[in-house]
């Protein structure tokens, strides 16, 4: 079970979290970029906006639109340190560990994959790094650890 699958029912029960949906334009963006690029963008956004011990503008740093990852952050309560504490038990006041970064990234990617469904009807750009990833045994979905490094 993925990180997201373990929380999906809780998000669905929240009036606020359950209202987020990807638009056709956002799905087309995911298809065009591919999951490797979306993963890299997600990690960059999390490292810059959430991972520091005291993120700038915490509580209002995640826009409601502009990138599918932003929408996914609101849908999965990974939008600010307060929501991360309340929903995922990731306490504020410390920089993310690599396990916490992986957990948050996988939570967001899980929601995006769930919302995106089958993207085969959308045009896509071939991933130049996919064959290199396969050759080095890099998986598309690394195992998900518990937040805070608890395995």
Regions found by a protein language model. Name each.
Residues 1-46:
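Core of compact, soluble alpha-helical bundle domains
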Residues 57-77:
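Immediate flanking context of iron-sulfur cluster ligation sites
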Residues 98-127:
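Long, highly charged low-complexity segments enriched in Glu/Asp and Lys/Arg with interspersed Ser/Thr
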């Amino acid at each position: 079970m993925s990180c997201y699958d373990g929380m999906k029912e809780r998000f669905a029960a929240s009036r606020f979290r359950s209202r987020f949906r990807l638009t056709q334009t956002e799905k087309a963006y995911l298809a065009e970029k591919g999951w490797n690029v979306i993963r890299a963008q997600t990690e960059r956004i999390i490292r810059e906006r959430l991972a520091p011990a005291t993120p700038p503008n915490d509580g209002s740093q995640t826009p409601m639109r502009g990138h599918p990852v932003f929408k996914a952050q609101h849908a999965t309560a990974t939008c600010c340190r307060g929501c991360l504490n309340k929903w995922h038990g990731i306490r504020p006041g410390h920089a993310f560990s690599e396990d916490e970064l992986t957990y948050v990234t996988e939570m967001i990617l899980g929601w995006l994959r769930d919302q995106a469904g089958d993207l085969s009807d959308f045009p896509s750009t071939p991933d130049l790094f996919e064959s290199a990833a396969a050759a080095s045994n890099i998986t598309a979905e690394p195992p998900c650890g518990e937040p805070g490094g608890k395995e």
